[in-house]
Structures are given as C-alpha cells and as structure tokens.
Design a protein with these regions (language model features):
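Glycine/serine-rich phosphate-binding loop and adjoining beta1-alpha1 elements at the start
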Residues: 2, 8, 79-169, 298-300
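An N-terminal-biased, well-structured beta-alpha scaffold segment characteristic
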Residues: 2-110
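Glycine-rich phosphate/diphosphate-binding loop of Rossmann-like nucleotide-binding domains
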Residues: 6-45, 152-240, 287
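Short acidic-hydrophobic, aromatic-tinged amphipathic segments that line or gate anion-handling sites
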Residues: 56-61, 115, 216-221
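Short glycine-/small-residue-rich Rossmann-like dinucleotide-binding loops
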Residues: 69, 75-76, 95-96, 221, ...
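Residue-level detector of alpha-helix initiation sites
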Residues: 76, 136, 177-178
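Adenosine-phosphate binding glycine-rich loop
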Residues: 118-144, 148-159, 269, 274-375
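Rossmann-like adenosine-cofactor binding region
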Residues: 209-291
C-alpha cells in the first residue's frame, strides 16, 4: 500500500503521524511511504531520519495526498486538507466529529473512508488510541491550571501546592477516567488538595483502591459538583462519552457561584467541551476570561509536548497502521471488530451513530459480518 504522512497544519500542532521507526516497519513489509518535508521537525525528527528508513520526502501536502492510498495524521484534517481527500482515500487520524458539522459534511462529500483513532476500541471496552493522548493531556492539565492560576494570567494567585502555613489549592477533577486519574495524580504530586468526581461506582472503587492515599473521590451528583466547584481554585474537565459530544457539567449561570479567578481547564474541548462557556483556544492564545473565571481550552494540549506525544501515539497506532496497510481496510476491519468501531465515514455516508445523534445526520454503518462483500 502507498502510505502518506503530511505535516500537521493545525495551529501550534507539532506532532507527526508517523515516526521513522514506523516508516521502517512499513517499508520492510513492502509498502511505500511518502512524507511531507519537515513533517516530523516539531517532534525532533528531520527529513533524513525518514529517508534513512526508506521514505520518499516530497515538498507539499498535495503531493502526499496525490500519491497515497492511506493518509496517516494526528489531528483532524483542516479545510484545505479536506479538499485534497477523494474517493479511494483511507484517512486514519483523530477526527472528533461530534462537535464539528463542517468537517463531518466535508468528509462525507469527499467519498473517503475515515477511521477515527478516538473510537477504536479494545477487548475491555477501552479506547487504546485515545488513551496515550489522554494520559499526556491529563498530566499536562494541572501544569496548565497552575499557570492559569497565576495572578499575571488573571487567576486567583494561588500556588497549587501551597507552602508551610498556607493551604494548598483545591483541585476538582470532573471525570475519573484516564484523563482524570492522570490529572489527579499529578495535581496531588504537586501538593494540591484533590477531589475526583465520577458517576461510575465501579470506577470510584478502583480509584479508591489504587489512589485512595493520594486524593479524595466522590459521586458526581449535581449537588456535589456545584458545592465542590464553588470551593475549588482549579477545575479540570475530564469527561468523555466515546465519539459523542461532551456533556456540559458547569453552566454559564454557575460561573457566578465560583470564586473570582478560578481556573477551568477543559480537556474535553475536542469533543465540544464540558463547560457551557468553553470554546477552543490555541497554544498561542490559550486562556480567556468570562465573568471573572479563567478558561484554558486548548484543543490539542498534547501538541505542546510533541516528542513525548508522538512517540506515545506511535506506539499505539502502529499495529493498526500495519494491519490496514497489509490487509486493506475492509479485511483489517473484518478481522478486528475493534478497529471496525473506528469507522466514522465511508462512501459518502456517516457511519458512527453517536456523531449522527449529535449532528442530526442519518447514519448507515455497514454490517460487520458483511464487510467481505464491500468493494
């Protein structure tokens, strides 16, 4: 198969879809790989690193799209990239379609087949291609929250860990999944007073068993959320409904109940955000203020640590990339129903029901058992 990797063009996105090691694996298996010049530069890989492993370096994204059967990226294709997609293309990347009708319609209109990292599953019902970036974003969230809390940035002027004789900051983490537990671990490690809320009792039991000595946990009732939010210095939004738009946990009206200068870090912003007042920001302009409350809503947080993020993502995606390249998407998805769960768009149709429900678009997913007859 002809595999292509363009340079990411989302603002301040420094990750890359393929590492030189991934190129080596693909080339050794008889596939050709085309990489846009400087695609890996932000993650610490130069063109010669890719050339040594057998990649063909080209000067533009258009050349990558023109040559490739499968396009491997990190972030959702931007408008100019979507114009280069066509029927016969296989796109493998993060998509986050539920809050993005424009991208969804463009992908449908392109006729491409699009498999989203964030909806690929595993035997335990987990999200193996979302997990590594959730770990990174979760661990970054307290750092970004601590920065946002600084007075010069509009925050409360509270040090996360406090000092002897002065209480530490109170951190509320909404959601006890991969993002939430990683955020809570780091915040607790920085000395903060941390509470994690979740609605899953089994998850709360796990958190209590594993992390009970580090931070508190509680059931995420509306009353508990409101009370703890009103006392918090930093609130980290870490909820996820796979492939669907994130639920709104703090309304605009509730901002008046928070302490002035409270920092909100919305890790769920890729899926629309879990605070009503959230809107996507960039690393260049990451925070904004509404009613005295500071919001940090960078949509590609792991891009700030591109080297770590690229290596972690590559470790997770490579087995799936190899399977897709070796077998083609139909056989690969037929053999692996968890990869099939990643199918979001195919042949001019939306195929992921949670996105259809969020956007009011009819979905038509092929039957898994009938994949072998597709062409």
């Amino acid at each position: 198969m002809k595999v292509g990797c363009p340079k990411e063009i989302k603002p301040q996105e420094f990750r890359v879809g393929l590492t030189p090691a991934a190129v080596n694996e693909l080339v050794r298996r008889g596939h050709s790989v085309t990489v846009e010049t400087n695609a890996g530069q932000g993650a610490g890989f130069v063109d010669s690193d890719y050339e040594k492993e057998g990649a063909d370096i080209v000067g533009s994204a258009k050349e990558v799209f023109d040559k490739a059967d499968m396009i491997v990226k990190v972030k959702e294709p931007q408008a100019i990239e979507r114009k280069m997609l066509k029927s016969g293309h296989l796109l493998f990347t993060y998509l986050h379609l539920a809050p993005d009708p424009e991208q969804t319609h463009d992908l449908i209109d392109s006729g491409c087949t699009a498999i989203a990292y964030e909806t690929v599953t595993d035997l335990n019902g987990g999200l193996p291609l979302l997990a590594p970036m959730s770990e990174v974003a979760g661990r970054l969230a307290p750092q970004m929250g601590a920065w946002t809390l600084q007075k010069a940035n509009g925050g409360r002027g509270v040090l996360l860990g406090g000092v002897p004789g002065v209480a530490p900051a109170k951190v509320l983490v909404l959601g006890g999944g991969v993002v939430g537990t990683n955020a809570a671990r780091v915040a607790a490690g920085m000395g903060a007073d941390v509470t994690v809320l979740d609605k899953s009792l089994s998850r709360l039991r796990y958190i209590d068993d594993v992390f009970g000595h580090l931070f508190k946990n509680g059931y995420a009732s509306q009353k508990a959320t409101a009370e703890l939010a009103s006392q918090a210095d930093l609130i980290i939004g870490a909820v996820l409904v796979a492939g669907a738009e994130a639920p709104k946990l703090i309304s605009k009206e509730q901002l008046s109940t928070l302490q002035s200068g409270t920092a909100l870090v919305d890790v769920a912003i890729d899926q629309g955000g879990c605070f009503e007042t959230s809107r996507a920001t960039t690393h260049a302009d990451p925070i904004y203020e509404i009613d005295g409350i500071m919001h940090y809503c960078v949509a590609n947080m792991p891009g700030a640590v591109a080297r770590t993020s690229t290596l972690a993502l590559g470790n997770a995606t490579l087995p799936f990339i190899i399977s897709l390249a070796d077998k083609g998407w139909i056989k690969a998805c037929s053999d692996n129903p968890h990869l099939f769960n990643g199918l979001n768009v195919h042949d001019g149709k939306l195929t992921y029901s949670a996105v259809g429900e969020a956007l009011g678009i009819e979905t038509a997913k092929p039957d898994h058992k009938a994949l072998s007859v597709l062409h």
